[in-house]
């Protein structure tokens, strides 16, 4: 039903969900802390963002929202249409290595876009749903929230693996163990 309430992924045969099928190229890129960061690109051009929503069923979300954190134009929003198989693709105008957020799933997915390069996201909807569940958020993860390929993929994977708070009010600071971030 269009605009209706739907539930996907209910398993009646057992309490365990079937193994998540990962497409080719969906790998985790760990950070090598001994490597230096590459020089940021500083040129105007078009970046391609493509990917797939894992465990997608027709009737789920039809659009994905991207926010460019452009140092010149400030915040700029773009949308990509989602195909019947859960795939999406769009191009974004960028002025260099640009931090970008996929903001369609309740928790931001951080990655980078660069002119002339492709950023590829495999978004694990099963894990994103688990993290937002009051009953299952402390259960065993279903893998990473996202698998990222493209510019600064190791750093993007690290940013999307660990959630962090940017609200630095006194109340939020009391809950954080700041010594662990040093």
Please give the residue ranges for each predicted region.
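A non-transmembrane, solvent-exposed segment enriched in polar/low-complexity residues
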Residues: 2-182
């Amino acid at each position: 039903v269009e605009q209706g309430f739907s539930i996907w992924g209910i398993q009646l045969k057992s309490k365990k969900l079937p193994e998540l099928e990962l497409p080719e190229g969906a790998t985790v890129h760990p950070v090598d802390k001994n490597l230096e960061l590459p020089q940021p690109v500083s040129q105007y051009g078009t970046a391609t963002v493509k990917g797939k929503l894992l465990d997608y069923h027709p009737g789920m979300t039809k659009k994905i929202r991207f926010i460019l954190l452009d140092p010149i134009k400030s915040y700029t929003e773009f949308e990509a249409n989602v195909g019947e198989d859960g795939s999406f693709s769009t191009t974004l105008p960028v002025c260099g290595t640009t931090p970008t957020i996929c903001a369609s799933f309740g928790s931001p997915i951080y990655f980078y876009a660069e002119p002339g390069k492709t950023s590829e996201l495999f978004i694990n909807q099963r894990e994103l749903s688990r993290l937002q569940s009051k009953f299952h958020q402390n259960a065993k993860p279903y893998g990473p929230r996202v698998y990222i390929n493209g510019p600064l993929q190791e750093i993007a994977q690290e940013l999307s693996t660990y959630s962090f708070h940017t609200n630095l009010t006194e109340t939020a600071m009391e809950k954080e163990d700041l010594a662990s971030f040093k």
